[in-house]
Amino acid sequence: MLGPVNARTPVADGISAPYAKYFRSRPHHPNRSTAWGGRIAHNAAMLTRLPPHVRTFRRAAPRRAWRLAVLAPVLTLLAGCGSAGYYWQSVHGHLSLMQAARPVDELLADPAVAGDLKARLALARGMRAFAVSDLALPDNASYHRYSDLKRRAAVWNVSAAPPDSLELRRWCFPVVGCVGYRGYYDEAEAQALAARLARDEGLEVRVYGIPAYSTLGWLNWAGGDPLLSTFIRYPDGELARMIFHELAHQVVYVDDDTMFNESYATAVERLGVQRWLATQAGDAARRDYAAFDGRRQAFRELSRQTRRELEQVYAPKPALAHDQKALYAMKDEAMARFRQRYAQLKADWAAAGTPFNGYDAWVAGANNAFFGIQAAYDELVPGFEALFAQVGGDWPRFHAAVRELARLDTGQRQARLRALAGGSAVKS
């Protein structure tokens, strides 16, 4: 995900809850540095390039002096775009993440590093190599280092939508344009923004942790995106998905079109992990991935069905134009059906001997912001998958075709992808 992020797809997948067990063994030390406005820190950092002697970040000195020297002009440039404090803390938060990074090769050679972490790092290194050789993803500085963040998420995103629409509130930033989320390194700051949006603007809000984000390749000169403790212990197939998704953001990224960007990266991760599992993974990893992905697709379909129902409720209807009570009653009915269907889905999983409650928190707090986030990650995936089939599964041709789509305006891009998918995005 630009995430993301999260993101990445973690939001659409409900990944925070299903993978909570991978975080519980790790102490939480809140990082008071705040704010990642979507993919914002990279925009600030790229505006002023650091000299080679500070490229590792960890050994540069005096640290405070060079940070101020580099970031002061950046903040001046950004002041006209929004809160200087927000951007300052965005840059500080990302620098803290970069300072914590150590080369993977160094960690693998360090006898003090735990064997289980070494195994995950070695696996991730192989996945990155596979992404380059088999998926035509970029071979650059990203994922050659590892950062132990000592917290459960890389950033916390805030999304918001009106009570009668799935259209996400958008925040606009330099270089990346406008996105449907605003991110923070400190969860308390994210919750505070969400509370203000709900109180002052009457919006429905969602705060969610993101395990990874992409700097879109702009910071390869400074070491690229590191592997993070927030996702390194994911099951094999999920770890591969994360790496493939974030690298895809470095191939194609279109300003002001979150749905296009995230759907493309989601298609890359899905298609890529299928190939990785078929050629690189063992039977156990394939079984585990099939089980989890089956649940994920069932939950996505359930969410997609409810989105369609809510879109019909919110569509302009003269009879409801002045009857908010009727509109909200229909909305409540759609939400109730969503929760009833989810309860049945859980019962089916339990009956099949694979009980799972990883989506419970998402369902309990489901609102317009939740469904708006979901749409960003999967709405156009079928079109991208159809495009991949159209080019014969040739990865370089696929990426080139996506670059051509990126040259079109938003409406044309979406129309082409929906046509490729057969007229509507109903399956991923």
Predicted segment positions?
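Acidic/His-rich structured neighborhood in mature extracellular/periplasmic domains
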Residues: 126-296, 311
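Short hydrophobic alpha-helical segments enriched in small aliphatic residues
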Residues: 7, 14-20, 29-30, 43-44, ...
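Pan-zinc metallopeptidase signature
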Residues: 301-428
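Bacterial signal peptide processing site
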Residues: 82-85
